[in-house]
Amino acid sequence: MKRILKLSIVLLGALFVLLGCRSESKSVFVFQTENSKITYTYVYDKGNDEVLSLTTDVVVRLSEVQELATATRQKRDELVNQIKDIEGVRITLSDGAKAIGFTIEIDMKKFKLNDPESRAKAPSLYQTMDIALIKKDDKVSFSASKENIERLEFVEQKEEK
């Protein structure tokens, strides 16, 4: 009985070591204009070069012309309504007097990049994901995704230590 217990403890310890070896990393990329800022935050498995999640944060500065500010809010709300029921996607909104924003969190375990029904329902989301999430070898590759968005002038933000 003691041998079984000792063996179980050793095997359990080995399992925890293997689980701890997963090399999860995070990278942030920003594209900024005079009126907007888009931030992509990737969480990825460094060893497998596989994206685990993508968070897209969009902030748009509002015009002082009320009609333009209202039109911007309406466009954002249309996008949110398209996206809100897609599996693996969580969305949050922010609203202020000078800027509005929204954050889209994509869980790659649940999100279906090649689902025709979801693509038809939320074409704007999938157009963005086709830029930010690049498949390579039957998985969403971080290195291929990074290369693609850097060509579009997204700048990687280095962590300050």
Report residues per predicted region.
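Bacterial N-terminal signal peptides that target proteins for export
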Residues: M1-I9
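C-terminal motif of bacterial Sec signal peptides marking the signal peptidase cleavage site
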Residues: V17-G20
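Alpha-helical transmembrane segments
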Residues: L11-L15
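Subset-of-secretome marker
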Residues: S23-K161
